[in-house]
């Protein structure tokens, strides 16, 4: 049977893609950021995933405001990139695994998630930048992918609770797949940032560091945030943390943090990176399934609310 070998959360800032295209990995401004990924490359060499489930948010390349599904899953044999207008070069297509994707889709629907199925799917920088960061060498790009797009732009957005539960359903789907493959779950986006309005340039370091700690040790508490709480504390585009919730939900309750970094100077987005490994595998992770995680949306009104006034 398939198993989840780990999860990675990483930012997907478009300027990273431009830096990669221009070979700036050793530029003094960029080097501290790119050096943070070297331990991840070593870890990936060690665990050798057979497939990557990539949870990201589309920015208007495949979906737009007139048609924006809450959750969409790719079921194609390949996923093409296209010009988004950011000045990023178009990259070569990524391989898919339709058989796995259809199993994932059918399992999620049986788990009462209404999924938009995409037999053709363009993937934007939120997908391609993380893949380029994690597998920078062309020969490493053979890992098949299953993209999952989460709505983070068109009201109403899915709640952190819903995204965390989606992750749990993805974990169940993976571990019910009959092939013996090692699956990596990647959540892209974040951390805190706001690109427009009165708070343009907003970064909340204290909240970001709280997220990096709680996503490991207490994801259920973090998932109690409402979307409005996330916008308040992480900025309008900081809601991309929803993809981190999906990734964490696909992991077991107990995880081991293998690596994390936090870096701000490359852009007006706080860049986060985290690698997690499951402490348990297989059926052990679902022993508590009968006591399904149930939390409601609520506005956080405790000392944590003070972090909304802290900026880097």
Feature locations, PLM:
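Divalent-metal (often Zn2+) His-rich catalytic cores of metallo-beta-lactamase-fold enzymes
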Residues: 189, 195-199
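Flexible, D/E/H-enriched segments
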Residues: 1-50, 62-165, 176, 198-296, ...
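Intrinsically disordered, low-complexity proline-rich regions
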Residues: 296, 303-305
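Glycine-rich beta-alpha junction loops
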Residues: 12, 189-190
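Non-transmembrane, aqueous-exposed alpha-helical and coiled segments at domain scale
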Residues: 153, 168-183
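Catalytic metal-binding/acid-base residues of hydrolase active sites
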Residues: 58-60, 191-192
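Beta-strand elements within well-structured catalytic alpha/beta cores of enzymes
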Residues: 50-56, 148, 181-189
